[in-house]
Amino acid sequence: MRYLEKTLQLLVACGLAILVGCSEAPPPEAPAAEPQPKMDSLVSAAWLQEHLGDPDLVVLDATVVIESDAAGNFQSVNGRASFEAGHIPGAGVADLMGDLSDPDADDQYTLPSPEAFAAAMGALGVGDDTRVVLYDRMGMPWAARVWWMLRWIGFDNAALLDGGLNAWTAAGGELSTEAVARPPRTLSVNLRPDLIADQGEVRASIDDESIRLIDVLPAIHFRGEWTMYERPGHIPGATNIPTAQMFDETGHFRPDEELVVLFGDDHDTRTITYCGGGIAATLDAFVMARLGFTDIAIYDGSLDEWTADPENPMEICFECFGDSGE
């Protein structure tokens, strides 16, 4: 069982703070939208307010809520209730606890097959000629996960809403409680398998200086002073660039000129990011893609999988501070 709930709680503590319908026949597929210029992978609330009514634009809320019980145990909760309480008008739900993950896998949030993912996105109105804006209300790791999955199947016309739902409301954006069902579209699969790393590739990276391994968890976790997984520390050879370092104090992504200081400019090096369960790792990967890095993958199993195998080494380094400090 994964411990992703704890990973996301840790990231929040460090500064990141479906509709089910039945019908006798499926709705007719929407006609192809007019092709639009490729948009930036990061859009502002002002941009979204201006383009919200564009017929080719699909807005999706990818929120998963992290809740705790009286004993302090954390768990993931479907974001449906928070969506129904108020969302960006016209938005749909990108359900990472539902059909955007493999329902038959033992581990939560396991990637579905490319075809199943494309079909699920198509059911949300995402097609080859649409544009997609993704957001969440939990620091953007969930939105980044869906963004990376879209990229994995070859879809590049998606963006994150900078600052998430908080930025939308801060800019005066209204919230809606109305559900909107979009006609389904066809989303093609042009798979990019190199965007996902497996345990074997990560093992090989330990002795391969040509591969860069990035741990996106907070420095206290990287050093091994505290852990939520089977064993403390980090994968040998990894450097630490915590996800919290991607954001300013308002929850917006930091300017590119500041982020490039964290990641450097060796754009062609094979780079693998990891976290606890393959969600938060997509944030660093998203930033690196924006900065022009060309060979990035996320380790989907991350420390959930890695630390469960006693044959996989872990390194403790109390004097380490990571690339970005605390």
Short names for language-model regions:
Residues 22-326:
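Cytosolic catalytic domains that perform sulfur/thiol-centered chemistry
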Residues 9-19:
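Bacterial N-terminal signal peptides
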Residues 1-11:
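Bacterial N-terminal signal peptides that target proteins for export
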